[in-house]
C-alpha cells in the first residue's frame, strides 16, 4: 500500500490544504482498518503486487484457452469461430441409429474433446442439465424442490407475469361481464314474476324417438299450415337417416378363400364360378329395388322454410291512388341572385318570400309571379381593396309567421334574427294587419328579457348585457311618426348596432380584410336579435308566438334559443349540447321540441325540460330534417338516405328510401297531407307519399298491410336542371299550405313552381 497517488488524483488537491492542517496526522499514527475488511485488503495487496505469488495486471489469468474461442482484452469470452463438424457416418447410418433407440440418441451431444463426435451423457450430466432448465442450483439440486419465485422474492418490484403454469388466471376464475349481465336480468325477471320456473319444460321423454308414428308421405299440403311452407304433410316433420346395408364379408362371397370353406363341416360354403350361381341371387334385384324405394321415401336433407322473393316485396298500388301530387313545371322565376337559401309561403299561400346571398328579401305573388317587395335586411361595404378571407353574410333561412292576423317574416342573416314586416295582407283590412304587426314587434327596452350573451335592437331602444337604452323616437301605431325628446338619445345611438366592424384578425390586430356591416331599422325591418355566432335555422311554433333558432357553430354558447314575442323574452334551455345541431322542430299536438343533431334526434318536454326519447336514423351524418303539421318526422343524410319516423315514436325509423345519388339538402312535408319532398345536390326533386290512416280510409282495400306507415315514391321532378358537371343542385323546397304545389330553388338562383 506504499504506492504514490496518480497524477489525476493528486491534481484535485492543493498543497495549501495539507499545510493548513486540513488532514492532520502525526508521524507515529497508523491507518486503522476494520476487521471485516482486513481479509479483502490482503487479497488486493497480494493480487496487485508484482511478486512471485501474484500475476502482473497486464497479463491474463492462467485459464485454458481454446484456439476456436474469441476473447476480448479483459479475457472474457465473446464468441467462437465456426467449426467444421466432421461427418458422423452416412445419412442412412444416422437415420438407423436415430430410430434404433430414440431416447438414447437424443441423450448424445457433440464432444469437442473427441473431435466433435457424439458422446453419451452421464446421469450426473443429465441431472445437471435438467436442473439448469428448471432454474435450480445444480450442485445440490436433488435435495431441493421446485422453488416458488413469488415466495422467495423480497424486494418491492413484484413480477406481474407468472413464470409457472400452475397459477390460474383471473379469466378462468370468474365469469365474463356478459354472462353476469344475463344472470342479473334473469334474477330481476324472477323477482318481478315475469319468469316462472316450470320443472317439466325441459324434461326429456325417455321413450322419445323409440316409437315411430304413422305418417302420410303422399298427402297434400295442410291448409292450416303457413302457405309459404310448401312441404307435404309429414315430409319435413322429422329427419331420418338413410338405410345403409352391411358390407359383405368373405363368408358371403361367391369366391371365398380356402380357409372359409367347410367351416361348419356341413358343406354349406362352396366356391362358385360367378355371382349368379349363389342361392340369394334370385332375390338380389328385389332387395336392391326395395332399397331404392326406401332411399326415395326418406328425406335426404333437412327441409327448410322456402321464401319466395316476390312474396316478400309488397304489392305497390297504382299511382292514381296517390294523387294529388305535382307533375309539371307551371312557372319559372329568375331572381338574379346566385344562390337561394330561404323559401317560405304565406299562411294562405297567396305570396312567397325568397332570400339568398345578396341579403335581400324578395316577396312574390304566387299566382302571377310578380315581385311585390324587395327588402334589404343586411348590407356590406368594403373598406379595403384586397379581400380574400371574408365572412359571407347572407340569408340562411326565412320563415313566414303562421298567424293570419299579422304579416311577419323571420329572417336568419349572419348572426342576427331579423323580424320583417312584409307589408301585405291576405285577408281583412291592411291597416289593421299592419297595426297588429307593429304592436307585436314594438317592444320596450325595459320590458325585454334577452339572454346574457344576446342583444335586442328595437325602434324604442337597445337591450344588451342586462342594460337597456331607451330612444326618443318611438314608433307610433296610429300616425307612424317619430317623437324626439328623450334624454337617452345619445346613449341609445351609441349602443345601436348601426355599424358593426368585423375584422378577421388575432389579438386585436387590424387585418387588411375589413368590412363594415350596416344593420339599420326602417319601416319594414322592425326588430333585430343579435346572437354571438352565425344563425343558420329558425322555425315557428304553429301558434305563431314562439320561434326557435339554431346556431351551428361549435363555439356558440347557445346552440338552441327560444324567443317569445308576446312577452319579449329569450331563453336558452340547453347548456350542454356537444354535437352539432342541424335543426329544431315543434310538435303540433304536444308541447315538445325535437332537436336534430348529426347522429340522432332528441325529443324534449318544453314544460319540464326533460328528455323524453331519442330517435336514431342509423346514418352517418344527418343534413336535413322536416316535420309537417302532423307527427311524421323525416330526416335526410349525406349518404342520400331518407328515414321516416311515423308519429315520432320508437328509436328506429319505420321506413327508409334511397333514391338520390348525392347529399340531401332539404326536406319538407305538406301540412295537409302525407306528401314529402326531398331535394339533393344531384338536381333531382323526389316526391313521395306516406301511407297513413287518411289515405287508407280514402281507398279501402287498395293498400297492403305491409305498406302502412311507409313512403311510396310518386314522381321525380326537375331532372333536366342538372348540369353536365353536376354543379347545379337543388338547395330548398317548400310546399304550398293549401294546394299540392311545390316551390323549389337551385344554386343558380332560379325558382320553379310545380303544380
Curated annotation (Swiss-Prot):
Region annotation Disordered: where it falls in the sequence: 1-65, 482-505
Compositionally skewed regions (Polar residues) per UniProt: 1-10, 43-61
One CC-aspect GO term: nuclear membrane
Region annotation (Interaction with EB1) ranges: 309-754
Coiled coil stretches, renumbered: none
Principal place of residence: nucleus
GO process annotations (BP): maturation of 5.8S rRNA; maturation of 5.8S rRNA from tricistronic rRNA transcript (SSU-rRNA, 5.8S rRNA, LSU-rRNA); maturation of LSU-rRNA from tricistronic rRNA transcript (SSU-rRNA, 5.8S rRNA, LSU-rRNA); ribosomal large subunit biogenesis
SUPFAM superfamilies listed in its UniProt record: WD40 repeat-like
Pfam families: BOP1NT, WD40
Cited SMART domains: BOP1NT, WD40
Compositionally biased intervals (Basic and acidic residues): 496-505
Keywords: Membrane, Nucleus, Repeat, Ribosome biogenesis, rRNA processing, WD repeat
Subcellular location: Nucleus; Nucleus, Nucleolus; Nucleus membrane
WD repeat residue intervals: 335-374, 617-655, 659-698, 725-755
Description of what induces expression: Expression remains constant in trophozoites and in encysting cells.
InterPro entries tied to this protein: BOP1/Erb1 (IPR028598), BOP1_N_dom (IPR012953), WD40/YVTN_repeat-like_dom_sf (IPR015943), WD40_repeat_dom_sf (IPR036322), WD40_rpt (IPR001680)
GO molecular function: ribonucleoprotein complex binding
Family as reported in the entry's similarity comment: Belongs to the WD repeat BOP1/ERB1 family.
HAMAP family tied to this protein: BOP1
Functional description taken from the UniProt entry: Required for maturation of ribosomal RNAs and formation of the large ribosomal subunit.
Subunit structure: Interacts (via C-terminal WD repeats) with giardin subunit beta. Interacts (via C-terminal WD repeats) with EB1.
Protein's name according to its UniProt entry: Ribosome biogenesis protein BOP1
Organism of origin: Giardia intestinalis (Giardia lamblia)
